[in-house]
Curated annotation (Swiss-Prot):
Keyword Cytoplasm annotated: yes
InterPro entries: Anti-adapt_IraD (IPR023776), IraD/Gp25-like (IPR007048)
Biological process (GO), any one: DNA damage response
Disulfide linkage: none
Source species: Escherichia coli O9:H4 (strain HS)
Main localization of the protein described in the UniProt heading: cytoplasm
Phylogenetic placement of the source organism: Bacteria, Pseudomonadati, Pseudomonadota, Gammaproteobacteria, Enterobacterales
Pfam families: GPW_gp25
Function: Inhibits RpoS proteolysis by regulating RssB activity, thereby increasing the stability of the sigma stress factor RpoS during oxidative stress. Its effect on RpoS stability is due to its interaction with RssB, which probably blocks the interaction of RssB with RpoS, and the consequent delivery of the RssB-RpoS complex to the ClpXP protein degradation pathway.
Protein name per its UniProtKB record: Anti-adapter protein IraD
A GO-annotated cellular component: cytoplasm
Amino acid sequence: MMRQSLQAVLPEISGNKTSLLRKSVCSDILTLFNSPHSALPSLLVSGMPEWQVHNQSDKHLQSWYCRQLRSALLFHEPRIAALQVNFKEAYCHTLAISLEIMLYHDGEPLTFDLVWDNGGWCSAMLENVS
């Protein structure tokens, strides 16, 4: 009887730790994006001002930025086991990036979307990460 109650409690504790890990990683990524002296590619620090001087529809340019971002994030965030980076929107006044993240010790993928807005990166998802 004692063993059954212990098994019922363990997944909840594990899930809570996973949720905290996910929120921590997302918060740290957002902080990295908004750091003025970040080691991320300049597009990802300065966002729209730099993006507007490029051909936003150039798929090769988008692919290059995604590779640069992936490399920088994997270097700066050791809790990420695997990462895929995609542009959701890349237009003259809109820049949105989606990160598909697999964390160590977490079997479920985490999707984290970032949007350039009013001179900085933000994510409406940060409050909803679980």
